[in-house]
């Protein structure tokens, strides 16, 4: 029977919006890889309690506020991991490697330069998404949608999800191509629709 492990992890940002990473010791499972700080839940602990304990033990910080970011299920050859990931909103203390591990503040755009355990890769993508993004409303015409997206980008939108079930496949495809050009270098475009259609943008 596959072993199951419940783990918590934290995305912690400093004032410069850099994200804290910790290097797994070489003598541990998946040693030498970078990870988001955290650890295993102990019996009777809630994920938030485990997170608070682990961050105090590992980093010497006390968290005051956090919110769920993502939950990840991942199967390794020898273990199934359930990973509850939280974004830490407020904490006290100066984060350091309290257990002797190397820690580093990393720019969000530089996360791709680091090697992570497979279960952490989904966290990397979630951490890089803007905290707020625009989802297009239904029941608008193509030109209304385009104008609204244009306005959202001018207002600083960094992630735009094109959700338009009212459009035909051809209308959606044409609009997506126009928005892809509009968003280039300014924002991420997320498409939501028929899988066969989305494959054309892969």
Regions found by a protein language model. Give the residues of each.
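Conserved N-terminal beta-strand and adjoining loop/helix that marks the start
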Residues: 1-20, 71
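Active-site-adjacent beta-strand/loop module that shapes the phosphate/pyrophosphate-binding cleft
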Residues: 14, 72-94
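Cofactor-binding loop segments of dinucleotide-utilizing enzymes, especially the Rossmann-like FAD-
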Residues: 15, 24, 137
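Conserved Nudix-box catalytic region and its N-terminal flanking loop in Nudix hydrolases
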Residues: 18-58, 69-70, 188-190
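A short coil-to-beta-strand element that immediately follows conserved catalytic motifs
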Residues: 61-71, 87
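NUDIX/MutT-family hydrolases
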Residues: 85-89, 95-128
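Conserved N-terminal beta1-alpha1 strand-loop-helix module at the mouth
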Residues: 90, 95, 125-202
């Amino acid at each position: 029977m596959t072993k199951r492990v419940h783990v918590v992890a934290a995305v912690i940002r400093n004032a410069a919006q850099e994200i804290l990473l910790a290097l797994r010791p070489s003598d541990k499972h998946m040693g030498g890889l970078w990870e988001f700080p955290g650890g295993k839940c102990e019996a009777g602990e809630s994920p938030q309690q485990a997170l608070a304990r682990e961050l105090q033990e590992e980093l010497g910080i006390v968290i005051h506020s956090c919110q769920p970011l993502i939950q990840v299920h991942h199967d390794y050859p020898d273990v199934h991991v359930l990973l509850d990931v939280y974004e830490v909103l407020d904490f006290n203390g100066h984060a350091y490697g309290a257990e002797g591990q190397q820690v580093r503040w990393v720019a969000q755009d530089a996360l791709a330069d680091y090697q992570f355990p497979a279960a952490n890769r989904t966290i990397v993508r979630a951490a890089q998404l803007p905290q707020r993004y625009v989802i297009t409303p239904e029941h608008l015409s193509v030109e209304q949608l385009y104008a609204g997206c244009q306005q959202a980008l001018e207002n600083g939108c960094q992630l735009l999800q094109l959700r338009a079930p009212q459009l035909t496949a051809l209308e959606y495809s044409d609009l997506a191509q126009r928005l892809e050009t509009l968003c280039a270098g300014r924002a991420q475009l997320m498409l939501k629709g028929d899988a066969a259609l989305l494959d054309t943008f892969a």
